[in-house]
Design a protein with these regions (language model features):
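Residue-level detector of alpha-helix initiation sites
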Residues: 12-13, 38, 110-112, 132, ...
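A Rossmann-like FAD-binding core segment of flavoenzymes
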Residues: 28-30, 75-93, 99, 166-262
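Glycine-rich dinucleotide-binding loop and its adjacent helix/turn
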Residues: 108-166
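Short hydrophobic core segments
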Residues: 9, 99-109, 150, 229-239, ...
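FAD-site-proximal beta/loop scaffold in flavoenzymes
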Residues: 121-143, 214-222, 227-306
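A short alpha-helix-loop-beta-strand transition element characteristic
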Residues: 30, 58-61, 255-257, 311-321
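Beta1-alpha1 glycine-rich phosphate/pyrophosphate-binding loop at the start
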Residues: 2-74, 162-183
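Active-site-proximal substrate-binding core of FAD-dependent oxidoreductases
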Residues: 284-291, 306-326
């Protein structure tokens, strides 16, 4: 008899927590955790905070040590899943191999939203989503250099605080009328603006980026009103896009994220999903929502693990967020 196998696609917070919770819920079959980044799964929230500021090493960010996965018989596989064959209950990997599953969990996360702006491919323009991204930024983050951060959300402001602490001259460009407009009240926006300006960060609102210019590397950020802002380094933080392409190609329901119910089930009863890649209807609010938070990813991972094990659990926690600046 073929042993049961749970395959988890995506080895960030949701995937790693789902794997651990499968064992906690009593899953005795195989557990395979597939990720496209080398090394052990790590926490992403510190990337724009302590890791960028040089206060933490990558080992400090690990969700669990290697011994945990060994003791729990969780197989870590460095590969990219290229296709899901639902009728055969099989996934195709970038290595050329295939892997069958009894239950499949999609924890594919999200990627940094790219700007369609002229000059965006110039050297010195970065996005911040992975540890490798941070290492590139840190290599260029020397005191006295001018960094322009496009986007005044949590990532943009946390990055601003970290780079300011490294002695850089920091300018934040926000297209709307206030920072954190999408996620907080005006009072909170005003608080963060005051804190940043007090630390010497220049906050510019209603600032629309028209283009980036430079000779090989970025030298200026050109605004829609014609103003040019000198820049030695640019960090773009304008949100994320859920990684739903794999699910969509497999015929699963997608609506601003992989659609799941309150038990983390997708439109296929043998496939669950958790984390930033999902959207679900919150009973409290009565509408579908996609949450980009580690707390939500952790809760969904617990529920998804219970569902795989045939137990009833439901996504119910209120969304909450935190930030660490200065």
């Amino acid at each position: 008899m073929t042993p049961e196998r749970a395959v988890i696609v995506g080895a960030s917070h949701a995937g790693a927590q789902l794997a651990a919770n499968l064992r906690r819920e009593g899953w005795s079959g195989e557990v395979v955790l597939i990720g496209d980044e080398r090394g052990l799964p790590y926490h992403r929230p510190p990337l724009s905070k302590g890791y960028l500021a040089g206060k933490n090493g990558l080992d400090d960010l690990l969700i669990r040590g290697a011994d945990f996965y060994e003791k729990q018989h969780i197989r870590l596989l460095n590969a990219t899943v290229e296709a899901i064959h639902r009728s055969a209950k099989r996934v195709s990997l970038s290595t050329g191999d295939t892997l069958t599953y009894t239950k499949l969990a999609l924890c594919t996360g999200a990627r940094a939203r790219r700007l369609p702006t002229p000059g965006v491919d110039l050297r010195g323009i970065h996005y911040l989503r992975t540890a490798a991204d941070v290492e590139l930024i840190r290599a260029a983050a020397t005191p006295g250099r001018r960094v322009v951060i496009v986007g005044g959300g949590y990532i943009g402001l946390e990055t601003a605080a970290s780079l300011c602490s490294l002695g850089m001259n920091v300018t934040v460009l926000e297209a709307t009328e206030r920072v954190l407009e999408r996620v907080t009240a005006p009072e909170v926006s005003a608080f963060y603006t005051r804190i940043h300006r007090g630390e010497g960060v220049e906050i510019r609102t209603h600032a629309l980026v028209e283009a980036f210019s430079g000779n090989g590397g970025v030298q200026e950020v050109v605004l829609a009103d014609g103003e040019s802002i000198p820049a030695d380094l640019v960090i773009v933080g304008v949100g994320v896009v859920p990684n739903t392409e794999l699910a969509s190609a497999a015929g699963l329901s997608v609506d601003n994220g992989i659609v799941i119910d309150d038990q983390a089930r997708t439109s296929d009863p043998d496939i669950v999903a958790a984390g930033d890649c999902t959207s679900h209807t919150m009973a409290r609010y009565g509408w579908r929502i996609r949450l980009e938070s580690v707390s939500s990813a952790g809760e969904q991972a617990k529920v998804a693990a219970a569902t795989i094990c045939g137990k009833h659990s439901a996504i119910a926690a209120l969304p909450w967020f935190w930030s660490d600046q200065y």
